[in-house]
Amino acid sequence: MPDPILLTPGPLTTSATTRHAMQHDWGSWDAAFNQLTASVCADLVAIARGGDEYVCVPMQGSGTFSVEAALGTLVPRDGVVLVPDNGAYCARILKILGRLGVEAIALPFGEDAAVDPAAVEAAFAREPRITHVALVHLETSAGILNPLDAIAAMCRQHGRRLIVDAMSSFGALPIALADSGIDALVSASGKCLEGVPGMGFAIVRRDALDACEGNSPSLALDLQDQHAYLRKTGQWRFTPPTHVIAALRAALDQYLAEGGQPARGARYAENCRTLVESMRALGFAPFLDASVQAPVIVTFHAPDHPAYDFRRFYDAVRDAGFILYPGKLTKVETFRVGCIGAIDAGDIRRAVAAIAQALESLGIAMQRVSADA
């Protein structure tokens, strides 16, 4: 029986080539593996258009490990971090800062509203103590895209440091770090690069990283120490996820062969268009306005029907070969469908057909939703 297609924001469906890359064992101190790490890091900086200003620091674990590593390493203990908050992953950053004992100021927005750069600027005026901004580029709770370039410009203008969680955007959406003023951009292997989960990374400005020696309260999550050791020896400080890195190397080779960010972004955008149009035809209304919808994951309102139960709906779709994602909003019942991974518009159409069959099996009839809804 074939594996189900994962319509999630990660882990996601990977290619056979990427999975095959994990069939070989690597010595973590061997020169060939060191070269593998170096080549992956070089490509990640190039994808971020970082130039010589930036270095890539890989880190074991999920993306959240690298987010915490970046915050713990780059923000001094007496720093004050502004966190624009429009979803669960923004809230996670606030929780991390709380555990680190760093003062954080939440700037709340609605779950369906992008971060407003003018509100960020107003917060700088109200709170001159703010030293850093921690921004989630693509808040996957709803799939909302926040205006990174405008906020980066605002931070440059006002002399604030910017750390970006680009977990679900890096590789699919255009990002140019050079001359941006961004201190660090964080992402992970198992998202839009279509690798497998297990490695995060921070692409960090060299001068910002070099100034942080001894700042991290953690040994394992010290980006500066990790980078210094890699630079000196070519090796990771502690056991690396060798198979994950080999899979990411294979995934990056496919990414570059596909055409890099423009081609990956175009495929995901077509997946997203196909998904939204097909789901509207079934009667599902997207939660977000199209102007702020990122082509990575789409949140839909759950059916307003007494027979609807997410678990039964999920199981019916899974039995047809597709894995959906539960909603993560606080005020309305929703579910989410991912557009990313080694999938195309044909897979999306088959998934929507499976959703239609699931509705029929549950006895749920819905009316087509217009594009204006």
UniProtKB/Swiss-Prot annotation:
Its cofactor is pyridoxal 5'-phosphate. GO terms for biological process: organic phosphonate catabolic process. Its EC number is 2.6.1.37. It catalyses: (2-aminoethyl)phosphonate + pyruvate = phosphonoacetaldehyde + L-alanine. The gene is phnW. The keyword Lipid metabolism does not apply. It comes from Burkholderia ambifaria (strain MC40-6). It is an enzyme of class 2 (transferase). This is 2-aminoethylphosphonate--pyruvate transaminase. The lineage of its organism: Bacteria, Pseudomonadati, Pseudomonadota, Betaproteobacteria, Burkholderiales. Gene3D superfamilies: Aspartate Aminotransferase, domain 1, Type I PLP-dependent aspartate aminotransferase-like (Major domain). The modification N6-(pyridoxal phosphate)lysine is found at K191. GO terms for molecular function: 2-aminoethylphosphonate-pyruvate transaminase activity. It comes from the Bacteria. Involved in phosphonate degradation. SUPFAM superfamilies: PLP-dependent transferases (SSF53383). Pfam families: Aminotran_5. HAMAP family: PhnW_aminotrans_5. Belongs to the class-V pyridoxal-phosphate-dependent aminotransferase family. PhnW subfamily.
